[in-house]
């Protein structure tokens, strides 16, 4: 045992899978969490066609495939496809033998118990890993920011969670989940671009809209004011070149799409905005910890990457909080990957090494051991 074996860290998101080695400062592999199967069998004679494609390859061949996302709203719903994604991660992306490395996976807050057991079972029985651990995504984001107490707003492609954490433990009674995230904002942007006369309808065109969203959208500090500015001048307009060379211009759509985070009613959703959800989660916590939560509001996930989101959040929470309360929003520049980074930090700590569930423990106790060792 001269050479320390690096643990594998895999953060399975609804939209993207992030994977790499513990101790690294960024994931080595980032690819779409998609499994594609041919729509028609046997039309591609001589192509040596596979019965399924994963990630970027599925994305690039999407014309002939039916695409499925095995993770919906942050929770695994299709285990066969999930297994394919993990297989692809180990063998094609990281090029490692999973039976030689401890594996750390991430899970959504309030993940069903049966899901954690199934995950544990697949890692040990299908991939024969020597050791395994599962960690809550928001908690890892908090670790990545160098804290153990705070409230994490984690918003990715499929789901948004608000998770208050005290001394490293998530407070389950105060966790909120909102089924509104990046994918919904992309769909909404598609809808409001159609009102301008630009129609995007296929799944391939949806990817273009996602790119427009990532490159041009931002959050307005004062929505009404911004709408006024946009109607009076063209200073907020930007142009975007489509793959076919056509150039389109977008104006108030740039901030109208992300505004849905603060006003979900525009999507026809009942829930309050992310600021209200955060405030409500804080109010569900013990009065003694609230000050620590207000002072450590940590943003994480790709949907928190919009320019202007921290300032807007600061303004909205300050308006809701008691007047003397110090409100601080932490938005690390690498927050798109902070769940993965937190996992990398955790799995490389010397104090963490006795926390792993070993293959031996699994063989003795079965999948339910995960509830005793990972919390």
UniProtKB/Swiss-Prot annotation:
Keywords: ATP-binding, Cytoplasm, Cytoskeleton, Hydrolase, Nucleotide-binding. The keyword Heme does not apply. Its main location: cytoplasm. It catalyses: ATP + H2O = ADP + phosphate + H(+). Its EC number is 3.6.4.-. InterPro entries: Actin, Actin/actin-like_CS, Actin_CS, ATPase_NBD. Signal peptide: none annotated. GO terms for molecular function: ATP binding; hydrolase activity. Coiled coil: none annotated. It is found in: Cytoplasm, Cytoskeleton. PROSITE patterns: ACTINS_1 (PS00406), ACTINS_2 (PS00432), ACTINS_ACT_LIKE (PS01132). GO terms for cellular component: actin cytoskeleton; cytoplasm; hyphal tip. It is an enzyme of class 3 (hydrolase). Pfam families: Actin (PF00022). SMART domains: ACTIN. Belongs to the actin family. Actins are highly conserved proteins that are involved in various types of cell motility and are ubiquitously expressed in all eukaryotic cells. PANTHER family: ACTIN. This is Actin, gamma. The lineage of its organism: Eukaryota, Fungi, Dikarya, Ascomycota, Pezizomycotina. The gene is acnA.
């Amino acid at each position: 045992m001269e050479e320390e074996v690096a643990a594998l860290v895999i953060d399975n998101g609804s939209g993207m899978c992030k994977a790499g080695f513990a101790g690294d400062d960024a994931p080595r592999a980032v690819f779409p969490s998609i499994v594609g199967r041919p729509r028609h069998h046997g039309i591609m004679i001589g192509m040596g066609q596979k019965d399924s494609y994963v990630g970027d390859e599925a994305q690039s061949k999407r014309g002939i495939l039916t695409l499925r996302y095995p993770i919906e709203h942050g929770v695994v719903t299709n285990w066969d496809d999930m297994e394919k994604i993990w297989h692809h991660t180990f063998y094609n992306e990281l090029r490692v033998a999973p039976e030689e490395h401890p594996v750390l996976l991430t899970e959504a807050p309030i993940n069903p118990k049966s899901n954690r057991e199934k995950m544990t079972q697949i890692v040990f029985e299908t991939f024969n890993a020597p050791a395994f651990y599962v960690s809550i995504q928001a908690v890892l984001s908090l670790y990545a920011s160098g804290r153990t107490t705070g409230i994490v707003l984690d918003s990715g492609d499929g789901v948004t969670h608000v998770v208050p954490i005290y001394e490293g433990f998530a407070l389950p009674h105060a966790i909120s989940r909102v089924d509104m995230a990046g994918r919904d904002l992309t769909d909404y942007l598609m809808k409001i671009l159609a009102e301008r006369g630009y129609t995007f309808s296929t799944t391939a065109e949806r990817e273009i809209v996602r790119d427009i969203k990532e490159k041009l959208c931002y959050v307005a500090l004062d929505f009404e004011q911004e709408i006024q500015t946009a109607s009076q001048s063209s200073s907020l307009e930007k142009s975007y070149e489509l793959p076919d060379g056509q150039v389109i211009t977008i104006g108030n759509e740039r901030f109208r799409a992300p505004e849905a985070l603060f006003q979900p009613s525009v999507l026809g959703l009942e829930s309050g905005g992310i600021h209200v959800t955060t405030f409500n989660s804080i109010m569900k916590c013990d009065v003694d910890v609230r000050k620590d939560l207000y002072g450590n509001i940590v943003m994480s996930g790709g949907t928190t990457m919009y320019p202007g989101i921290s300032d807007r959040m600061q303004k909205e929470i300050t308006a809701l909080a008691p007047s003397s309360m110090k409100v601080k929003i932490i938005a690390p520049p690498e927050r798109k990957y902070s769940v993965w980074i937190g996992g990398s930090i955790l799995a490389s700590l010397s104090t963490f090494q006795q926390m792993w569930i070993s293959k031996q423990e699994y063989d003795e106790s079965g999948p339910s051991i995960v509830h005793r060792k990972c919390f």
